[in-house]
């Protein structure tokens, strides 16, 4: 079972639907309706932290999940979840050069983790106004995906490889290989 943290965003249920289509049982909990102790007592194999229109300060329990469980259980941060991973490890979250909402972009990647066995580049849909600043990307994190102009679109913890983030939306119909990205995350649960 996957715990899907809902940061009060409608895209959460698109993620839940995609996971269900991959035959994954999903438990959705709002970011202020579950505690770390409750999470530790659940029988889950992984956690996905959903998007949100705000910044990491709006992510509720998500920061604690990354800080205290990121070395124990596979975690995938999507959009805000991705930014929150960067923030927790000391990265600066800044305004993107351009506001991007519902726009497909060319994304280059390293072919590892959630990007395993995907063509390179892929087209992915972006909905965000914030990004992890490249210059302040923490040493603990490696950049796994990027745009043509060098904006960070994917990260992975160097030591805890199961802690990954993607800035774009795999659940968007315009994202190429979105289900495969989620399947690749599921594959790392075993």
UniProtKB/Swiss-Prot annotation:
Pfam family, any one: GATase
Molecular function, one GO term: anthranilate synthase activity
Catalytic reactions on record: chorismate + L-glutamine = anthranilate + pyruvate + L-glutamate + H(+)
Amino-acid biosynthesis recorded as keyword: yes
Main location: plastid
Location(s) in or outside the cell: Plastid, Cyanelle
Domain Glutamine amidotransferase type-1: 1-190
Superkingdom of origin: Eukaryota
GO cellular component, one term: cyanelle
Keyword Amino-acid biosynthesis: yes
Residues annotated to bind L-glutamine: 52-54, 83, 129-130
Entry annotation: catalytic residues: 79, 169, 171
Listed pathway(s): Amino-acid biosynthesis; L-tryptophan biosynthesis; L-tryptophan from chorismate: step 1/5
E.C. code: 4.1.3.27
Enzyme class: lyase
Biological process (GO), any one: L-tryptophan biosynthetic process
Sorted UniProt keywords: Amino-acid biosynthesis, Aromatic amino acid biosynthesis, Cyanelle, Glutamine amidotransferase, Lyase, Plastid, Tryptophan biosynthesis
Misc note: Component I catalyzes the formation of anthranilate using ammonia rather than glutamine, whereas component II provides glutamine amidotransferase activity.
Subunit and partners: Tetramer of two components I and two components II.
Protein name listed in UniProt: Anthranilate synthase component 2
């Amino acid at each position: 079972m996957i715990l899907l943290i809902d940061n009060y965003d409608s895209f959460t249920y698109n993620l839940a639907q995609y996971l269900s289509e991959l035959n994954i049982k999903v438990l959705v909990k709002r970011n202020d309706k579950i505690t770390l102790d409750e999470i530790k007592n659940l029988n889950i194999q992984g956690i996905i932290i959903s998007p949100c229109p705000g910044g990491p300060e709006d992510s509720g329990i998500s920061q604690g999940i990354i800080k205290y469980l990121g070395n124990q259980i596979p975690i995938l941060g999507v959009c805000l979840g991705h930014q929150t991973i960067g923030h927790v490890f000391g990265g600066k979250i800044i305004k993107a050069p351009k506001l991007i909402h519902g726009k497909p972009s060319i994304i280059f990647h390293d072919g590892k983790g959630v990007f395993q066995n995907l063509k390179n580049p892929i087209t992915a849909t972006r909905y965000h106004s914030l990004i992890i600043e490249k210059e302040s990307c923490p040493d603990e994190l490696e950049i796994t995906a990027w745009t043509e102009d060098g904006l960070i679109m994917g990260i992975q913890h160097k030591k805890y490889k199961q802690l990954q983030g993607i800035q774009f939306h795999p659940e968007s119909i315009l994202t190429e290989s979105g289900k495969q990205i989620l399947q690749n995350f599921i594959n790392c649960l075993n």
